[in-house]
Regions:
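Catalytic P-loop NTPase motifs of RecA-like helicase/translocase cores
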Residues: 39-40, 171-172, 298-300
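Flavin-dependent oxidoreductases
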Residues: 188-222
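FAD/FMN-dependent oxidoreductases across multiple families
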Residues: 202, 214-216, 224-226, 233-303, ...
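Conserved mid-domain beta->alpha element of the FAD-binding
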Residues: 8-25, 29-36, 163-164, 220, ...
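C-terminal helical "tail/cap" subdomain of flavin- and related membrane-associated enzymes
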Residues: 1-5, 67, 83, 261, ...
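Conserved N-terminal helical subregion
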Residues: 2-7, 24, 49-195, 238-247, ...
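Short, low-complexity Ser/Thr-rich regulatory SLiMs
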Residues: 137-138, 222-224
Length: 396
């Protein structure tokens, strides 16, 4: 038996740790470089659809995810301050039966902790925290990695491959692959957690709620094991205002919308703004260096698929890096398998944002379509998304 291949990964986020686990299961040695002092994740809620859940289950995380997540029975859609839902989309057991895994919501930090705990159980995964910088030298299959560790020492290695899972502001993409800087989308996500009792009588907390308005939209869902409800409010903001976002609350006037006014009043701890940027680049790899997740294809969250695409990426790339004759061959095959799908998800996400924010009279047509599709119409429309098998794709 030869020496196992070594793969270096930049970033101990959801993309990086999922890939580390997937590679470790194939027997590869994995080193994860993380600039933070611990595995940490910004944000609050996270939606895990069936296409991502199947990957996590395959990595042995079924129990950990089930323990910390919640499965909504459906999605209540409230356009323009309606008292009752225009439509309730079916989720729950129906979606699990159709796609082979449930649709769940959970706190991002809980998923990251589950991934980190699983990674710690593998002797062939090393996670190096507080890495201040790294340098790559690449020519063909020859690759040298130098990582500056917190004690001032430099870790030097010649791995089989280097994967940038270093997020929307990826150094791997911009410094080593000639990729673009992330582009501001014009949208900001404002996140908050509130106590469930503050929304009593306002929303059905057995379901997710989607509030639509021409100036914003809001997604609300419970995180029961944290005794909290996740609020994600999306507004359009001018780029010149971004530096002062954290000094103010979102500028939303509820008007006659009693429900919205109550939700806004329930936020005691304040809102945390998150500027939404996107990445579109055809350059996912060069030689033995490649990208996954937001580093390659950050997208608007309006189909709730950013994390899911990162998780899919890991499932597809791992077997390719394990079996391909060269890292370049693995990355090339990975791009061929993933780029078209990811582009489609990016386009659907952007389109959803426009649909959510439609003003009168276009909102009338939107509402008519939502009503006519019925509670299960979204299944057929999204079969291609939720029914995808990333594990099988990586074997092709």
């Amino acid at each position: 038996v030869g020496v196992p291949r070594t793969v270096y990964i930049a970033g101990a986020g959801i993309a990086g740790l999922t890939l580390a686990l997937a590679l470790a299961k194939f027997g590869l040695h994995v080193v994860v470089l993380e600039r933070n002092a611990s595995a940490s994740e910004f944000g609050a809620g996270l939606q895990i659809s069936a296409n991502a859940r199947k990957v996590l289950d395959n990595l042995g995380l079924s129990e950990a995810v089930a323990e910390k997540s919640f499965t909504p029975e459906g999605i209540d859609i409230f356009p323009d301050g309606r008292e009752k839902p225009l439509q309730t989309l079916t989720l729950g057991k129906t979606i699990e039966t159709r796609f082979g895994a449930p649709y769940a919501v959970m706190h991002r930090a809980d998923l990251l902790e589950a991934l980190h705990a699983a990674a710690r159980r593998f002797a062939n995964i090393d996670i190096v925290f507080s890495v201040t910088d790294f340098a790559l030298e690449s020519s063909g299959s020859a690759l040298t990695v130098k990582a500056l560790e917190p004690d001032g020492k430099t870790r030097k290695a010649k791995p089989f491959a280097f994967v940038g899972a270093d997020g929307v502001r990826s150094v791997t993409r911009t410094r080593y692959l000639g990729g673009p800087e992330a582009r501001y989308t014009g949208e900001v996500a404002w996140r908050a957690l509130v106590a469930p009792e503050t929304l009593s009588g306002m929303l059905d907390l057995s379901r997710t709620s989607l509030l639509l308005n021409s100036r914003f939209h809001m997604v609300v869902y419970p995180l029961p094991h944290r005794n909290a409800v996740n609020l994600a409010l999306f507004t359009q903001e001018k780029e010149r205002d971004l530096p002062v976002l954290d000094q103010r609350a979102p500028r939303i006037k509820p008007g006659k919308d009693r429900r919205l006014a109550h939700i806004l009043d329930s936020v005691d701890e304040g809102w945390t703004p998150w500027v939404l940027s996107s990445v579109q680049t055809p350059n996912w790899h060069r030689d033995a260096i490649g990208l996954i997740g937001d580093a390659a294809h950050a997208m608007l969250p309006f189909q709730a698929q950013g994390a899911a695409m990162s998780i899919e990426d890991a499932a597809v790339l791992a077997p390719l890096l394990a079996a391909s004759p060269s890292a370049e061959h693995a990355f090339s095959r990975f791009a061929a398998l993933r780029q078209e799908r990811v582009k489609r998800v990016q386009e659907v996400s952007a389109s959803n944002g426009k649909i959510f924010h439609m003003g009168f009279p276009f909102s009338l047509a939107r509402n008519a379509v939502i009503r006519s599709e019925g509670p299960e119409g979204h299944f057929k429309r999204l079969d291609w998304l939720y029914g995808y098998d990333a594990i099988q794709s990586g074997k092709s």
